[in-house]
Design a protein with these regions (language model features):
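Conserved C-terminal "lid"/linker of ANL adenylate-forming enzymes
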Residues: 520-523, 529, 548, 570-633
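Conserved AMP-binding/adenylation subdomain of ANL enzymes
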Residues: 213-233, 238-343, 353
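Structural core segment of the AMP-binding/adenylate-forming
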Residues: 55-56, 79, 83-165, 568, ...
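Conserved pre-ATP/AMP-binding loop-to-beta segment of ANL
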Residues: 22-24, 137-138, 156-194, 201, ...
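Conserved AMP-binding A3 loop
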Residues: 36-40, 160, 181, 190-216
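Conserved ATP-binding/catalytic segment of the ANL
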Residues: 423, 432-497
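AMP-binding/adenylate-forming catalytic core of the ANL superfamily
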Residues: 95, 112-114, 448, 453-454, ...
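Conserved AMP-binding/adenylate-forming core of the ANL superfamily
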Residues: 25-79, 96-101, 158-161
């Protein structure tokens, strides 16, 4: 069998050349037990679904939508539609009904699978406003009570029933399925991924099989240690391209995929499944860091002393290794003791087999990466956007430089361009890598196999981000540091104060997030005389410190006025302000009772703040901070 060049070719290649059909492919929890699904079992369902869709009249290029949690059903549906040349159009489960309606109509989706009753009801409410939608597929039992009384233009069929009907059609359509799979070209569209964005209407990013496949093979050149014996624990939404890339990499290498039940059960699922690979966002790593520090320092007495000694030992050991030197006998022995007494207990919470974690979807604060490095847990940072398929750069395991996102992957060019003059400071590739390269800061632009085909139905918007020379303008500000790409912030996030000083919120916010008291920081200050912020304290820490019950967080007042709590936060803000330039320091702040959330439309699914939404929503409260300062500096 020739090497694959498209997404549906990957799983067939794995079965032909890496694992037999009876080898475990997927794992998911059913009631109290983890159930293994072999490649053969998965392919049987995948072919059945393909046959059913062909019988329905689905053809190459048709869009088929998903609004479903991670799990085997996502894989079956995705692989089935991909191999007949249809286009995966995933929808974030957290999106509103109006956003779902917009995506279904903009994409012209002909079918949608809904993962649970809540998501099914969302789809039902907008279905009759979507003329192209002809099938709604609930992936759960007892769906009739939600849909029977409704007059729907689209037909409704349970996913399990669809599969059973498809099994009876497979032989009839076997040749057509195989022919459809072979007819897919690398230039054909594989998926539409609608970026929620921090502003405006969602845009459908058009990614081809070439985009996604090349991202897989070239990322693996950078991280060649993903193997067929690995196990990936999936919990970030597969509707996001970052998680989907690791899903593709797992299939390509023959690694198993286990599906976490939920974010709340992630810690338990890690201990149960013992993964070797995990993808996460920086906020999760920050929470693990905060909890570990809190547990280690609150024990008191000799336990706290041992914990702090172990961290210091881990840091010394890491720094020696990073300098390319060999640790001495004394330090090596101390490291073994630190690992036995402290680090091994933290690692055990991950299942004890973790080779590395990949952090993406935002910049990882330098101190968080260093903390995990001190424990002996490798964090590889990746960088990219939905529009870049997504990976542009990823850390090499032998060359971790905290605060950077690694080396450019093969096959693409990345340049740093002056925002005002458009002068290009440097163009870098994987092959011209220089360890000592340091450049000016500017907008990161990229061209090559990773760049999207464009925005669906939006040629003008496509032309604003992909220039005549093929450069995609990411909107991210960064530079090269010690050969690696380093991200500062989003260009559109930049604040320019009343005195003309440029302030990038993300690095400033990350400085204040070093406080274990603080969960979220939202900086304000564009065209203002000084910086202010909305601060969200960590709920658990605040409850323990002030003896608060759950009713406190259910109060209708958005902001906490209690002077004791405000001063408690202010103490850490003043201390951390010393790490910043004076014009970057928070001068006034408000303490928000509950976190910014996706449900309230304040953050994206990748936990990025929707700055314009938040500024508009809390405009009156923000204005008050410029009338009367709550001193933090």
């Amino acid at each position: 069998m020739s090497q694959p060049t498209t997404i549906p070719g990957i799983i067939r290649n794995t079965v032909a050349n890496i694992h037999p059909e009876n080898h475990t492919f997927l794992l998911h929890k059913v009631k109290d037990s983890w159930v293994e699904i072999s490649y053969g079992q998965a392919l049987e369902k995948i072919d059945a679904i393909s046959a059913w869709f062909l019988n329905m009249g689905i053809k190459k290029g048709d869009r088929l939508s998903l609004i479903i949690e991670n799990g085997p059903n996502y894989v079956y549906y995705d692989q089935a539609l991909q191999q007949i040349g249809a286009v995966n159009t995933s929808i974030y489960p957290t999106l509103t009904e109006s956003e779902i309606e917009y995506i279904l109509n903009d994409s012209g989706a002909k079918a949608i699978i809904a993962g649970n009753p809540f998501l099914f009801r969302k789809v039902l409410k907008v279905a009759n406003n979507c003329p192209s939608l002809i099938r709604i597929i609930p992936a759960f039992d007892d769906f009739e009570k939600h849909s029977d009384k409704l007059k729907l233009n689209a037909g409704v069929i349970n996913f399990e029933q669809l599969i059973q009907e498809g099994l009876g059609l497979v032989e009839q359509y076997r040749h057509q399925i195989n022919a459809a799979r072979e007819a897919i070209l690398p230039s054909d569209i594989s998926c539409l991924i609608y970026t929620s964005g921090t502003t405006g209407i969602p845009k459908g990013v058009v990614l081809t099989h070439h985009n996604l496949f090349q991202n897989v093979v070239n990322s693996l050149i950078q991280i060649p240690f993903v193997e067929k014996t690995d196990r990936f624990l999936s919990f970030l939404p597969l509707s996001h391209v970052f998680e989907r890339t690791i899903y593709h990499i797992s299939i390509y290498t023959g690694a198993q995929i286990a599906f976490a039940q939920s974010l709340e059960l992630l810690a338990k699922n890690m201990e149960e499944t013992k993964p070797t690979i995990l993808c996460c966002v920086p906020r999760l790593l920050e929470r693990i860091h905060d909890k570990a520090i809190k547990n280690g320092t609150s024990a008191g007495g000799i336990k706290t002393k041992i914990f702090l000694w172990a961290l210091e030992t881990g840091k010394k050991y890491r720094l020696v290794n990073e300098a390319g030197k060999k640790p001495g006998i004394l330090l090596s022995n101390q490291q073994k003791i630190a690992d036995k007494l402290v680090f091994s207990k933290i690692k055990a919470k991950t299942g004890g087999r973790l080779k590395f974690m990949v952090s993406g979807g935002g910049a990882l604060p330098k101190n968080i990466g260093e903390f995990f490095g001190d424990l002996g847990i490798t964090i590889l940072e990746g960088f990219g956007l939905t529009e870049t398929s997504p990976v542009m750069a990823v850390t090499e395991r032998h060359r971790v430089i905290y605060g950077t996102v690694g080396r450019i992957i093969p096959g693409i060019e990345v340049a740093i361009q002056n925002v005002d003059t458009r002068h290009i400071y440097t163009i870098q590739t994987h092959d011209n890598f220089k360890e000592d390269l340091q450049t000016e800061e500017g907008e990161i632009i990229v061209r090559g196999h990773c760049v999207m085909k464009g925005y669906w139905n939006k040629p003008e918007e496509t032309a604003t981000v992909i220039d005549a020379d093929g450069w995609f303008h990411t909107g991210d500000i960064g530079r090269f540091y010690r050969g690696n790409l380093q991200i500062t912030d989003r260009l559109k996030n930049m604040l320019v104060n009343a005195y003309g000083k440029n302030i990038y919120p993300t690095p400033v916010e990350n400085t204040y997030l070093k406080s274990p008291k603080i969960e979220q920081v939202f900086l304000v200050g564009d065209k203002r005389e000084y910086i202010t912020a909305i601060i969200v304290p960590g709920r658990e820490t605040m409850q323990e410190t002030f003896g608060l019950n759950n009713e406190f967080f259910e109060k209708t007042d958005v902001f906490i006025e209690d002077k004791e709590i405000v001063d408690w936060i202010g103490h850490d803000l003043r201390k951390l302000s010393n790490e910043l330039a004076k014009f970057e320091r928070i001068k006034a702040f408000k303490v928000k009772r509950n976190p910014f959330s996706m449900d309230d439309g304040e953050i994206t699914p990748t936990m990025k703040a929707k700055r314009k939404v938040i500024e508009k929503k809390y405009a009156t409260d923000i204005d008050q901070m410029y009338l009367q300062e709550t001193e933090a500096d």
